[in-house]
């Protein structure tokens, strides 16, 4: 009877999870046909939803009419910051630093959740995130390692490394504006939030 199912998994594990849900979905079709269901996939890999939808309908043989009328299979972007005491530590500290971006539309009331935010262009935003969040983060990790820092948090406080990170974002913005349908103002807002994340 769930309204929402969240699959916070590695990309390669999502099909297996959907396979395990098959029995429950078939039971729901028989006993609770009209109730709406949202399935959220929390992974950094992009452009997966259509393949997963085809997997549900073609491979798992979930009834198409029921699925199209009652199920929203959606992607999301988890914007978080993780730290550890050492690079080989198995215990991580993770905190949410911005709202969870969810591909719209969905079948539940997002307004009831403080940290949830719907987004109409999630695939594009996920691609952009790769350049505005991940590229300076990766540069910081690489250069920080060369400088002898143990953590990204320490490295990001170095003036020279911070300059390199900012240069990565500036270079990325040029390519993004020429490749994606996003305004400079929208991109600046997205990048500003990215910088807030990296500085936390």
Task: Briefly describe each language-model feature range.
Residues 1-200:
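Substrate/ligand-engaging "lid" and interaction regions
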